[in-house]
């Protein structure tokens, strides 16, 4: 059989076409882009609070180019004052403009390995709106007072002008927090220390309200200049990432409370409770692993966290997390507030990423209308339509990202055909076992026909496969030895066989 050469670029093109992703800008938008390139703003012309004296920093990944948030923290009497500055995209992108219509249509930026399809043109996302160090930038400011108990005591929102003091990476900040001299500026150091002190308080508050702690296993592809996969790197979630996450959650909560206080419609980020049917399915798999999940009532986040913490001690937390995640409802955008189950919050918006998420841009416009004493341009029906479209766009983008990841993993797996691995059964279905190998982030199928010289019956209630003669049982969590038999990137298919 002739081996078909794998092409990263052609696979990306197929994904773009399959998921109807738009990677080009039309003529009208290109004309607008030219205007932005020549536009010079006069900071004296706008009613903005000048906060350039504060040592804001951006903290992002090494490869980030669109810096849409900057943070600064200081002591305030016996509390903490957190400033979260978010790029003022709404200042540049007017409602129903050509760029706005295209951003609404895209809904989100789509992230592929080494390649991004942006929601906004680069002149905005990486230039005018990006909070690059040493440049005067327009922002929408969330100024939040947080008590020693981690609760928000008060908040203000206003238009502001900042100049970021430093572009830091998660690794830099994490190294600094681990007593490595990765940062030298005294004012920046003071800000980081304050942010970390606040983070520890917010972390305790998160634990107290029992927000679900999903530490999912993430990895990234190492791709060379020729777009060839040279390896896979496990991404360890750093404390610096969690620090920024907690600051963003605080700003998102404050934005939700601010809009609600001003009696305006909003576009909420909601996460419903899991259904009883999903809980029952999860409880069967968890029972096979030795965990008890109460399936007689609606599950609470405290119970989920207890199981996850216990699984970490037994070293099967990745499997347990994946089972629980499958039971969770999808988060959505809607003007109807039902709270956020996963974060254990009564009211939540997405406010902090208007460069890459359209709902955040909508929330910015609503906040700016309140600040500037203008009428809200979005009624409930408008927001409902935008929420539905944004949720669909998010799901479509995630599906595209997952599909390319699966194709790349299959291509990576071809290097290991014939190799034996230790593996764990992740899922039991009527046609076989889905397994994950220990040494690499590779998953695949052992077809039921290759399990042995007998007929295997799928007991759906117990979620097991059982041999009709030997009574051999296969269940979720079983540790087995496997051999990678074949991998077909075009079909996103990896097949294993048992090693006896």
For each feature predicted by the language model, list its residue ranges.
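C-terminal structured domains
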Residues: 469-471, 475
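Electropositive polyanion-binding surfaces
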Residues: 1-452, 462, 477, 483-500
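Short, structured beta-strand/loop micro-motifs enriched in basic residues and often containing a Trp
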Residues: 458-468
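Classical nucleotidyltransferase
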Residues: 449-456, 469
């Amino acid at each position: 059989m002739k081996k078909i050469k794998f092409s990263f670029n052609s696979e990306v093109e197929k994904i773009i076409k399959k998921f109807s992703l738009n990677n080009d800008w039309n003529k009208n938008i290109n004309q607008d882009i030219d205007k932005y390139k020549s536009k010079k703003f006069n900071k004296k012309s706008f009613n903005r609070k000048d906060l350039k004296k504060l040592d804001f920093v951006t903290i992002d990944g090494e490869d980030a180019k669109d810096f849409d948030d900057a943070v600064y923290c200081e002591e305030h009497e016996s509390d903490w004052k957190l400033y979260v500055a978010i790029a003022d995209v709404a200042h540049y992108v007017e409602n129903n403009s050509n760029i706005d219509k295209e951003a609404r249509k895209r809904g989100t930026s789509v992230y592929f390995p080494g390649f991004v399809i942006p929601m906004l043109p680069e002149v905005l996302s990486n230039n005018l709106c990006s909070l690059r160090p040493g440049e005067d930038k327009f922002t929408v400011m969330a100024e939040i007072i947080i008590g020693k108990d981690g609760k928000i005591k008060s908040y203000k929102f206003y238009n502001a002008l900042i100049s970021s003091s430093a572009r830091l990476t998660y690794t830099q900040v994490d190294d600094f927090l681990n007593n490595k001299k990765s940062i030298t500026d005294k004012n920046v150091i003071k800000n980081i220390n304050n942010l970390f002190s606040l983070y520890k308080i917010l972390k305790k508050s998160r634990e107290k309200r029992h927000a679900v702690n999903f530490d999912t296993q993430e990895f990234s592809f190492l791709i060379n200049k020729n777009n060839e996969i040279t390896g896979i790197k496990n991404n360890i979630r750093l404390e610096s990432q969690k620090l920024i996450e907690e600051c963003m959650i605080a700003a998102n909560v404050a934005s939700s409370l601010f809009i609600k206080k001003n009696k305006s419609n909003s576009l909420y980020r909601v996460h419903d409770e899991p259904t009883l049917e999903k809980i029952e399915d999860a409880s069967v798999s968890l029972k096979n692993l030795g965990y008890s999940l109460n399936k007689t009532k609606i599950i609470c986040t405290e119970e989920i966290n207890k199981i996850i913490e216990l699984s970490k001690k037994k070293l099967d937390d990745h499997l347990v997390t994946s089972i629980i995640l499958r039971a969770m409802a999808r988060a959505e955008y809607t003007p109807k507030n039902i709270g956020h189950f996963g974060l254990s919050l009564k009211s939540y918006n997405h406010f902090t990423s208007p460069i890459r998420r359209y709902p955040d841009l909508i929330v910015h416009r609503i906040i700016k209308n309140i600040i500037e004493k203008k009428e809200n341009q979005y009624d409930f029906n408008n927001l409902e339509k935008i929420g539905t479209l944004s949720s669909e766009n998010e799901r479509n983008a995630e599906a595209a990202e997952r599909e390319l990841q699966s194709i790349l993993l299959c291509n990576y797996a071809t290097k290991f055909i014939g190799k034996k691995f230790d593996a764990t059964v992740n899922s039991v279905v009527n046609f076989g076992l889905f397994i994950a190998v220990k040494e690499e982030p590779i998953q695949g199928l052992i077809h039921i026909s290759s399990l042995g010289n007998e007929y295997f019956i799928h007991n759906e209630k117990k979620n097991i496969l059982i041999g009709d003669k030997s009574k051999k049982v296969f269940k979720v969590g079983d540790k087995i030895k496997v051999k990678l038999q074949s991998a077909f990137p075009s079909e996103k298919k990896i097949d294993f066989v048992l090693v006896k």
